[in-house]
């Protein structure tokens, strides 16, 4: 009886140890990627790496950046994947991102990566802003299609424009930074003061203004070009317009807590297989051998603003403080 008990206990212990040995290791990944693409990236990674399970923590760029900064002394993220390059530069400066050279880095477009010699972040894609213009609503309201940023300050558009709050949204911040860098400080703030008179509200999501334009809640949304292209493909009555001086950034990946599993997530995120998923939504991706054109995506390259990403990171706190003092009163309530 005793032997049977010992054999049974030993078998149970072996089973438990075997189960633990093969249990997938969880890696906490902070991201600002759009919610509807997270499952696709997770499933693709885990199908090639069944011993690792990605646990996403997702929010908009501004909120995710603030969260990472607040957790600096007790980081909970192991990997940051899909966050704006300017935020990644700031996180590296604060010592939150750790230098790491992933396998396959030589195949990446260098202009999307950390420009410093001790690299800590690598571009997955480039994302762009656009003006999402609802043609049906515009016809009802007799609104002409805007052709320039200055057009959006005309009185005819009063109350018909939505834009992301730059303190919450990286999409919003990169456009604010593009205006300041390309118009100059004084002219940039003066422009935003005029634009604010026509703004219906500021959202806490970079894609929401375009979603609202697609649904006819507003006529115009300053938003993500990729979201506009996707909504148009799905049948929304949108024109996706790119005025001269459109904001853009890289979305990047970096290491917070070094481990074999975390490094494998980063290695896969820059792989050709991962980039073939990115190209479905973004017109420019990190891998040099992956090209294509997202459906209904506008020609953005000719109207891209000149962007200094290091400046975007270093000026971020001051710019957001000034913007919030001037314009935050029109922001939607935070959910």
Give the location of each predicted region.
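An extracytoplasmic/periplasmic, membrane-proximal ligand-sensing/linker region
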Residues: 186-187, 286-335
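Early extracytoplasmic/lumenal segment of secretory-pathway proteins
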Residues: 24-89, 211
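A bilobed periplasmic-binding-protein/Venus flytrap-type ligand-binding module shared by bacterial periplasmic
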Residues: 132-137, 177, 249-261, 269, ...
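A ligand-binding cleft/hinge motif common to bilobed small-molecule-binding domains
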Residues: 86-90, 214-237
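Periplasmic-binding protein-like
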Residues: 110, 157-164, 191-196, 202-203, 232-257, 269-292, ...
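Sec/Tat signal peptide C-region and signal peptidase I cleavage site
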Residues: 19-23
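Extracytoplasmic ligand-binding site segments that recognize negatively charged/polar headgroups
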Residues: 32-39, 76-217
